[in-house]
Regions:
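Active-site proximal loops enriched in glycine and acidic residues that flank catalytic Cys/His/Asp
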Residues: 258-259, 267-273, 307-313, 328, ...
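Acyl-donor binding region in acyl/amide transferases
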Residues: 80-164, 281-360
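Flexible loop/turn segments at secondary-structure boundaries
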Residues: 67, 77-80, 129-131, 181, ...
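C-terminal "cap" of GNAT-fold acetyltransferases
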Residues: 175-190, 369-408
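A conserved beta-strand-loop-helix scaffold within acyl/acetyltransferase catalytic domains
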Residues: 19-63, 71-81, 203-310
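Acyltransferase donor/substrate-recognition loop-hinge adjacent to the catalytic core
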Residues: 150-228
Length: 408
């Protein structure tokens, strides 16, 4: 076996195409979009490079010259020094079922990160936001993957754990049948808050992107801005997020709650893009874009992908959550475009959101695990802190808020 750094078009093509071998017999597999992967490693498109971020990629070739594995290692300037110990990252890991091959790939990451001066690595994660390429699938390997979520063979888990990685936190993915009415507990609370004539719930059809961004910013900063390890969002970030959704946005499923003119909650979803991307074979070249736009325009969609759900602090637990769920059932479902929803990225460190999800009548659909490995075994390991439980010592290596935009 030979490990080669990605340095040109040939090795980049091998980095992208290695999945063809690994998932050749997996009927559920839908590849990530090539262009989504490539922009992560493009200094012109990934702002982390301008902030001093560093990255390296490798492809592992077998005895016959075929690509049999890949991996990337990186130092994110926003998160590397978030805690007491500098931590880098590794991700985009793919490998045949061969432990020696897996060790070669992980060793490459470790050695490179040690040279960069960090003491540990999280993985598999993204060199960017948490909404894509984050976590290792460790529960429920049946069914097609959702857009942006990692999908992998079951044997990857043994590679990570045998190498010494430990579970830092889990990302939970839930499924809900939209035909099921909102649970009684939500209806009762929703009715109470709805009795206030100032309260309303609305979709965003006809609302400008600039206004949606300002609503999003206000609720996000109120809901998460004060949590340990979270920073307030800037308006430029909010605008960028909404702009990135432009082509795929369905304003009817961008749901906001208001008290008067003040936004106090949101339940934001997009169409499940993999219902369309399954037809483009992982490539949005000109032909892939044509097929995607055709599917987007004419294919009947079934699933919406919940990307973020939040309520301003002062209104949490007062029925706003239920009112937005009730609105979805009474207004969105009768439109006939969606039958079910996938609620992604609920961290197991977020008990408040887990309680809300538990009362929604959802089913746990998948679990993805973010692992952490300290290179020095004498460094004490701690799981991700639970939101709302502020530690006496500020020694946990939290991820920066800017890495969890669009997630719960």
């Amino acid at each position: 076996m030979k490990l080669v750094q990605v340095s040109d078009k040939k090795t980049n093509d091998a980095f992208i195409s290695v999945t063809r071998l690994i998932y050749a017999q997996d009927k559920n597999y839908i590849p990530h979009i090539r262009q989504d992967i490539e922009k992560v490693f493009d200094p012109k498109k990934n702002k982390l490079f301008k902030l001093g971020g560093k990255c390296e990629r490798w492809v592992l070739f077998g005895e016959k010259g075929e690509a049999i594995g890949r991996v990337a290692a990186f130092v994110n300037p926003k998160t590397v020094n978030a805690g007491m110990h500098p931590v880098g990252g590794m991700g985009f890991f793919e490998c045949i079922d061969n432990s020696d091959a897996a060790i070669m790939l992980m060793n490459a990451c470790k050695e490179w990160l040690v040279n960069e001066g960090v003491l540990g690595m999280d993985g598999p994660i993204n060199f960017g936001e948490r909404d894509q390429f984050w976590g290792l699938l460790t529960e429920n390997f049946t069914g097609k993957p959702s857009y942006g979520l990692n999908y992998n063979p079951p044997y990857y888990q043994k590679f990570f754990e045998q190498y010494g990685f430990r579970e830092y936190f889990k990302q939970l993915v839930f499924w809900r049948d939209l035909q099921i009415p909102a649970q009684e507990i939500f209806v009762k609370k929703a009715d109470i808050v709805s009795s206030n004539s100032e309260f309303s719930v609305k979709g965003m059809r006809g609302v400008s992107h600039a206004k949606i961004a300002s609503y999003f910013l206000e609720v996000y900063n109120s809901a998460w801005g004060g949590h340990e390890g979270f920073k307030s969002m800037r308006i430029e970030q909010a605008r960028s997020i909404i702009k990135s959704m432009n082509v795929i946005m369905d304003p009817d499923i961008l749901i906001f709650a208001f008290m008067g003119e003040k936004p106090i909650g949101f339940y934001l979803s997009i169409p499940e893009l993999n219902e369309f991307f399954v037809h483009v074979n992982g490539n949005l070249n000109w032909w892939g874009k044509l097929k995607f736009m055709y599917q987007l325009k004419f294919k009947k969609r079934h699933t919406m992908l919940g990307i973020v759900f939040g309520v301003s602090k002062e209104y949490q637990g007062k029925g706003v959550e239920g009112a937005m769920i009730k609105y979805c059932g009474e207004v969105v479902v009768p439109m006939g475009r969606y039958k079910d929803t996938i609620l992604t990225w609920i961290g197991d460190f977020n008990p408040r959101m887990l309680k809300v999800i538990g009362n929604l009548g959802t089913e746990l659909y998948r679990s993805l695990t973010t692992y952490r490995l300290y290179f020095d075994s004498s460094i004490p390991f701690e799981r991700h802190p639970v939101l709302g439980e502020r530690k006496a010592s500020q020694n946990s290596d939290n991820q920066n808020t800017e890495e969890v935009i669009g997630n719960n």
